[in-house]
Amino acid sequence: MSLVPTPQTDTGDCSEPTPLRRQPTQRRSARRVERMLDACADLLDEIGYEALSTTRIADRAGVAIGSVYQFFPDKRAITQEVTRRNVEQFVSRVGARFLEEDYRGWWEAVDAIIDEYVDMHRTVPGFKSLHFGDVVDLNLLDSDSDNNTVIAGRLRGLLLKEYGLADSHELDVAVLVAVEAGDAVLKLAFRRDPDGDTEIISAAKQLIRGFLPRQLSPFRG
């Protein structure tokens, strides 16, 4: 599971440089790159990462293979960029929800974040095949930290800024454990039901609600 704060509380982008060989400078080039990413996302759901190739991505996107290599060195780089796009979309959607809704505390915010994760898993092409990159590479978001550690850092930033928690190493550990546990349970929910077993999703929320209060109470500012 990947939990991130609103854009206002973001603790920074993933530290790994963009996998793009170069940034598109014209609107037409930017649209072409977006078509490549859309094609990659669709194909991931249809055929999986192992069968994915730059040739198939080019064919689906309706671009020349040379155009693909102009921006990406290989299929992993394209997949990495799809993952980054998913992260940014997730941040934006959670941020919009936080602006529109009032929460009594961090526990309701966590429920909302889980709800956004579940909705993206159901509706966003490529998301169910990648999650946040762990299916392809545990270090897809950052070469030095595994993907869930990166996402836990985002949630930590939210707790520090929005809910008055004191910074500490223990807080880092508590949030990372919550993210790893929630991730495992949500994956179980989608293994049992392609749309996500609602009972298991509810259990994931209860699990985090039960664990974090005991861990976070010593760190309240």
Model region roles, listed by residue range:
Residues R32-C40, I57, I78, V82-F90:
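Generic hydrophobic, amphipathic alpha-helix propensity
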Residues M1-R31, L216-G221:
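N-terminal intrinsically disordered/low-complexity leader segments
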Residues W107-A112, T123-G153:
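Short secondary-structure transition hinges
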Residues S129-G133, L141, K161-I208, F219-G221:
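Hydrophobic/aromatic-rich alpha-helical bundle segments in the mid-to-C-terminal region
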Residues R35, L43-A77:
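Helix-turn-helix
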Residues A39-I47, Q89, R93-E100, A181-A189:
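Solvent-exposed, amphipathic alpha-helical segments
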Residues E81, G95-R122, A178:
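Hydrophobic alpha-helical connector segments
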Residues L37, W107, D111, D115, ...:
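An amphipathic alpha-helix signature
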